């Protein structure tokens, strides 16, 4: 039997783009202008480590400059290649357009296994990579603003920001050259949890729409829904934690590199996370059944499947066996174009990656604005809000005394109402609002157009329309 060839990640993104673009009336040539990647820079640089020079290959792709700066993460992984980086850069363009973040799309990567190097060696490598990018304006607050991705985090972003600042000593906005930095290096509260929190807000908004929930063959709210998470990294961990602790969902399956855990009664996400930190994997975790083959749990009966690791985990080889009626793409491109068609034909509802995992770039946008304004969110108005609330509470207390037993304030009302919003609360509020508005834009297309039968196509139509309007406004 001849094996079916899957399209590459880049080809999958283009196929999904083409499906949406075919339903639009774009001016001649503009469709291709939006689809193609503007530029990809490949750098090979040497770093002296352990007595010899090691050569590393890195990429930074700029997909679209309809808005500047361009924005997108930098990942560290051995599998990084030009095809992957260009696909991810394209997704960033559409993602930013969908959530109305004022950026074009970009993405970067370095071919490296971070586990093989000491911290001081990783710093040397990261600083040299940042130097190579910054001297070509591929790291710059007004040109190209990287962020963390797979294999990178706050530590790497702090090194990159410092390297840029050393090279641009008079740039007062130097901190805005990257986002995802630690709080004490110009970061913002809520950035680490942002993508996982965005997954939670996306699911909440989906379940606020009963007709959409019905399309997935479900009813009710998130409470009690059975969840399987593939990948318990930063995104998967936070999404699973918030859904189980705040929304009453039951995480019944967790899939990691060394197998999968399954417990129909629910799994303690925090306990599994601590187990992974201590032991390096999920094997031998005591409170769930371990399976060496993660595919069995991926294909198990559940209500919500959250692929939160690499691209292409749901493909033509396993799509028919996926039983979840609702998939939310926490990772970039976890469902191939072929698998997407199979799942759509089965009636599976997919909340697409370009919307679902946009929490990261949304909060990165907030961090970038914070760095450019040089002031913490809430600093100017928090105490003034508390003073105004105090006036209202004082009047309510007078009313309470006057009415006696006929009416009284709730015991915790005063404490909750008097507390002004801090930066974390403002960030979460802004993210929640962003995810709601973006979902409504997708949903409107999904419901109003007879030729659109899935959320992914709807998301692409919204994003492509916004990018095309931006290009046309510039005179293209």
Where are these regions (language model features)?
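General beta-strand structural signal in soluble alpha/beta enzymes
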Residues: 87, 171-172, 253-256, 306-307, ...
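Rossmann-like adenosine-cofactor binding region
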Residues: 259-350
């Amino acid at each position: 039997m001849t094996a079916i060839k899957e399209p590459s990640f880049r080809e999958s993104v283009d196929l999904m783009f083409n499906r949406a673009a075919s339903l639009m009336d774009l001016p001649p040539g503009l469709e291709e202008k939006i689809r193609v990647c503007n530029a990809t820079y490949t750098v090979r640089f040497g770093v002296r480590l352990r007595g010899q020079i090691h050569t590393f290959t890195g990429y930074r792709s700029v997909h679209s400059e309809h808005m500047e700066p361009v924005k997108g993460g930098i990942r560290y992984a051995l599998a990084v290649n030009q095809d992957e980086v260009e696909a991810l850069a394209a997704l960033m363009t559409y993602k930013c357009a969908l959530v109305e973040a004022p950026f074009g799309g970009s993405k970067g990567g370095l071919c490296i296994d971070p586990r093989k190097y000491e911290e001081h060696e990783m710093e040397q490598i990261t600083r040299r990579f940042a130097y190579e990018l910054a001297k070509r304006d591929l790291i710059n607050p007004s040109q190209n603003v990287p962020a963390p991705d797979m294999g990178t985090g706050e530590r790497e972003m702090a090194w990159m920001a410092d390297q840029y600042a050393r090279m641009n000593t008079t740039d007062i906005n130097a901190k805005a050259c990257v986002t995802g930095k630690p709080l004490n290096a110009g970061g913002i509260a809520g950035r680490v949890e942002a993508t996982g929190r965005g997954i939670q807000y996306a699911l909440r908004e989906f379940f606020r729409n009963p007709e959409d929930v019905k399309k997935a063959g479900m009813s009710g709210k998130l409470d009690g829904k059975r969840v399987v998470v593939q990948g318990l990294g930063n995104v998967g961990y936070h999404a699973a934690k918030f859904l189980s602790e705040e929304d009453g969902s039951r995480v019944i399956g967790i899939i990691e590199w060394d197998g999968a855990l399954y417990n129909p009664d629910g799994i303690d996400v925090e306990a599994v996370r601590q187990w992974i930190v201590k032991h390096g994997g999920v094997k031998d975790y005591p409170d769930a059944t371990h399976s060496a083959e993660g595919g069995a749990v991926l294909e198990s009966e559940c209500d919500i499947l959250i692929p939160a690791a690499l691209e292409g985990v749901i493909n033509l080889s396993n799509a028919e066996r996926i039983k979840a009626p609702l998939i939310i793409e926490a990772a970039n491109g976890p469902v191939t174009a072929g698998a997407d068609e199979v799942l759509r034909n089965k009636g599976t509802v997919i909340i697409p990656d370009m919307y679902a995992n946009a929490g990261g770039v949304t909060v990165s946008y907030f961090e970038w604005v914070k760095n450019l304004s040089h002031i913490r969110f809430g600093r100017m108005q928090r105490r003034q809000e508390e003073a105004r609330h105090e006036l209202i509470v004082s009047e309510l207390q007078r009313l309470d005394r006057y009415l006696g037993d006929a009416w009284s304030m709730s015991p915790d009302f005063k404490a909750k109402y008097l507390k002004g919003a801090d930066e974390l609360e403002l960030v979460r509020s802004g993210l929640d609002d962003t995810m709601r508005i973006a979902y409504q834009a997708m949903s409107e297309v999904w419901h109003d157009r007879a030729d659109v039968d899935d959320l992914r196509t709807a998301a692409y139509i919204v994003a492509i329309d916004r990018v095309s309007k931006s290009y046309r406004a510039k005179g293209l």
